[in-house]
């Protein structure tokens, strides 16, 4: 995972971000420096509890002396580095990336911040055509169990789910990228149905998905019936009681019923990752 060094660092580096001097510990990334400077740098494939994979290119910034834009989520800071996060070149790149993504998949259930970024950068995905024309996108949702749904019409191939299923959390490797080019997609081994795969239903893939391609079955059903209302939900933090690890749970409650369970990514015990019991073992608590 990409972690900023803690404790007393051996070396502090000083760089300039949008004209402001920022001091960060050696080993920090440009994104760390941007956030320390209070800048809202968009990210899609990055998460604080996952290893950067550099695929979305939304977080790119301009570094003085570099011919190409660089991904801030993984580029380590160097002493004296001069970074521009809001230049015309950066804004154009981010606008185009967001347009291409939003024109290729359905984004109506994506995280709210994605819509905010699109408005901020003036993205107009409609000028790219209808996303339903893409063969790999126009596919029905995979409802294969009672826990969660895979709706790949909304998948942007950020690979967060693959990372969470693999080295960064669960080490199950039940899913991976299959195919190439326009045929690339997330798949189980040999494209078997999820209950027949190596999946252990920890749900960590759901916890990191930014576009709603992976959702709780409860949320999916409530959206179909028009009863899902995120604004009306109350979130209560508690501690999972199934074992002695002490994982923190955020219970999302609507109409006095638990509709889904998440975990804070910045919690020191599990970094937001849970097992099947913590993520889905709450049906007994329903009124």
Segment roles from a protein language model:
Residues 1-14:
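Terminal leader/tail segments of proteins
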Residues 252-287:
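Cofactor-/ligand-binding subdomain signature composed of acidic, glycine-rich
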Residues 232, 236-264:
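Catalytic and ligand-binding motifs that coordinate phosphates/metal ions
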Residues 195, 199-202, 270-274:
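Short beta-strand-alpha-helix junction that forms the catalytic/metal-binding core
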Residues 59, 158, 202, 243, ...:
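Short Cys/His-rich metal-coordination motifs, predominantly Zn2+-binding knuckles/fingers
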Residues 57-58, 66-198, 206-207, 212-239, ...:
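Fe-S ferredoxin-like electron-transfer domains
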Residues 13, 20-79, 93:
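N-terminal cofactor/phosphate-binding cores enriched in small/glycine residues
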């Amino acid at each position: 995972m990409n972690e900023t060094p803690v404790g007393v660092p051996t070396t502090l580096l000083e760089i300039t971000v949008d004209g402001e001097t920022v001091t960060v510990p050696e080993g920090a990334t440009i994104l760390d420096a941007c956030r320390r400077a209070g800048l809202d740098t968009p990210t899609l494939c990055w998460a604080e509890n996952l290893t950067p994979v550099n695929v979305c290119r939304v977080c790119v910034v301009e570094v003085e002396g570099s011919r190409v834009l660089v991904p801030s989520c993984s580029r380590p800071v160097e002493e004296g580095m001069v970074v521009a996060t809001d230049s015309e070149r950066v804004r154009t790149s981010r606008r185009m990336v967001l347009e291409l993504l939003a024109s290729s998949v359905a984004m109506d259930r994506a995280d709210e911040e994605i819509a905010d970024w699109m408005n901020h950068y003036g993205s107009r995905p409609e000028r790219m055509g209808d996303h339903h024309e893409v063969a790999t996108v126009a596919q029905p949702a995979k409802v294969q169990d009672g826990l969660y749904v895979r709706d790949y019409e909304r998948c942007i191939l950020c690979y967060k789910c693959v990372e969470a299923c693999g080295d960064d959390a669960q080490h199950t490797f039940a899913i991976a990228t299959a195919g190439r080019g326009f045929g690339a997609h997330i798949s189980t081994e040999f494209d078997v149905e999820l209950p027949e795969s190596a999946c252990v239903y920890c749900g960590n893939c759901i916890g990191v998905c930014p576009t709603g391609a992976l959702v709780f079955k409860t949320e999916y059903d409530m959206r179909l019936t028009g009863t899902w209302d995120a604004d009306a939900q109350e979130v209560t933090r508690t501690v999972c009681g199934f074992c002695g690890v002490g994982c923190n749970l955020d219970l999302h409650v609507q109409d006095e019923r638990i509709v889904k369970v998440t975990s804070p990514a910045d919690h020191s015990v599990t970094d937001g990752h849970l097992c099947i019991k913590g993520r889905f073992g709450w049906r007994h608590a329903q009124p």
